[in-house]
Amino acid sequence: MTAASMGPVRVAFVVLLALCSRPAVGQNCSGPCRCPDEPAPRCPAGVSLVLDGCGCCRVCAKQLGELCTERDPCDPHKGLFCHFGSPANRKIGVCTAKDGAPCIFGGTVYRSGESFQSSCKYQCTCLDGAVGCMPLCSMDVRLPSPDCPFPRRVKLPGKCCEEWVCDEPKDQTVVGPALAAYRLEDTFGPDPTMIRANCLVQTTEWSACSKTCGMGISTRVTNDNASCRLEKQSRLCMVRPCEADLEENIKKGKKCIRTPKISKPIKFELSGCTSMKTYRAKFCGVCTDGRCCTPHRTTTLPVEFKCPDGEVMKKNMMFIKTCACHYNCPGDNDIFESLYYRKMYGDMA
C-alpha cells in the first residue's frame, strides 16, 4: 500500500485515537476511554441503555433515587438528572426527576400531582416522575400471644384486604420469642412548629433500603417545610455488610440471629470516599427458616465522607437501633410490598 493510499487510513486512525484518549468532562472522566471487551450490558425492562457521562461506554442508566456520578448517568428518557447538592459536592449525587415530570405506571401516563388507585389495596400519586403509594388496607400488627401464638394474614373470599387469623401450632417445640409480623419502623411525626391552618403536613415512612446488603438508598416524601411543598428526601442505608457470613454466628439450636454483634468499629465507604469517623453500627441478621430480618427502629444522622482528593461531603444516613425477624417478607412479585410503602401522616386510617 502506498503512502498516498494510507493517508485516509492514517487520518482516521489519528481521529479515532484522539476520541478514545480524550479527557472527558468531570472528575471521573480524566482518564482515557476504556470499555469492557464484552458486549453492551443487558438492562432490566424499562431501563435505558445510554452512553456514560464521559461519552465512552454504554451503560444501564441509573434510576430514580439511585446514586449517580459523572460516569454513571441517570435515565434521560424518564426526565431524570444527577442532583449533586451543593456546588462543592461534584462527585456523587442522587438521580432526581425534573419538576413536573410525568409518571408511567402500568402502561398509563400520569401527570405530576395526579392521584390514582392502582388496585383495591393502594392509592397512588405521581410526583415529579416518581410514584408513591399509600396502603388502603389496615397495616396493624398482631404479635404472638397465649391465645394466638401463630397469627398470620390470609386472603378471604370476596374481600380485598387480608385479615388476621390464628393458626394452631403444628410443632409445639418451635414456639419461641421471635416476632411473627413485620412492624413499622418508628418515625417522627410532623414538627409541631410546621402545623399551620393552610397546610396539612404529610410525611411518608422511609422506604426500605434499596439493597439488602451494602450501601443503598432510602427515600420518603414530605411537605414538612416552610413552603408546604412536597419534596423528596433521601438517606444512605446499610441493612448488613455484603461480605459478612452471618449464618455462622447463629447459636446452636437457634434459627435466627436478629442483631449480630460487630467486633470492632467500622468506617463506611461510598464510591471511593471513606467516613471521617468510625462507627459501632448495628446491622440486621439472617434466619435459616425463611424469615426476614429487617430494621425495626431507626434514626437518621449526618455522616461526613472524605474523598481521595481531599474533598469532604456530608450525607444523611440511616442507623439501626433494633431489628425484627418475621415471616411477613416482601413479595418479589409485589412492587409496593417490596418497597414497604406505608400510609402518610395525617391521612384517615
Curated annotation (Swiss-Prot):
Gene it is expressed from: CCN2
Related illness: Kyphomelic dysplasia: An autosomal recessive skeletal dysplasia characterized by bowing of the limbs primarily affecting the femora, along with short stature, short and wide iliac wings, horizontal acetabular roof, platyspondyly, metaphyseal flaring and distinctive facial features that include prominent forehead, micrognathia, microstomia, cleft palate and low set ears.
InterPro entries: CCN (IPR050941), Cys_knot_C (IPR006207), Glyco_hormone_CN (IPR006208), Growth_fac_rcpt_cys_sf (IPR009030), IGFBP-like (IPR000867), IGFBP_CNN (IPR012395), Insulin_GF-bd_Cys-rich_CS (IPR017891), TSP1_CCN (IPR043973)
Tissue expr: Expressed in bone marrow and thymic cells. Also expressed one of two Wilms tumors tested.
Alphabetic keyword roster: Cell adhesion, Disease variant, Disulfide bond, DNA synthesis, Dwarfism, Extracellular matrix, Glycoprotein, Heparin-binding, Secreted, Signal
Domain TSP type-1 as annotated: residue spans: 198-243
Pfam families reported in the protein's UniProt record: Cys_knot (PF00007), IGFBP (PF00219), TSP1_CCN (PF19035), VWC (PF00093)
Subcellular location: Secreted, Extracellular space, Extracellular matrix; Secreted
Annotated ranges, domain CTCK: 256-330
Source organism per UniProt: Homo sapiens (Human)
Family: Belongs to the CCN family.
GO molecular-function term, one example from the UniProt record: heparin binding
Signal peptide as annotated in the record: 1-26
Domain IGFBP N-terminal, first and last residues per copy: 27-98
UniProt cross-references to PROSITE patterns, sorted A to Z: CTCK_1, CTCK_2, IGFBP_N_1, IGFBP_N_2, TSP1, VWFC_1, VWFC_2
Entry coiled-coil feature ranges: none
Keyword Iron-sulfur: no
Oligomeric and partner information: Monomer. Interacts with TSKU.
Name of the protein in its database record: CCN family member 2
Residue ranges constituting the VWFC domain according to the UniProt record: 101-167
Disulfide links within the chain: 29-54, 33-56, 35-57, 43-60, 68-82, 74-95, 256-293, 273-307, 284-323, 287-325, 292-329
SMART domains (UniProt xref): CT (SM00041), IB (SM00121), TSP1 (SM00209), VWC (SM00214)
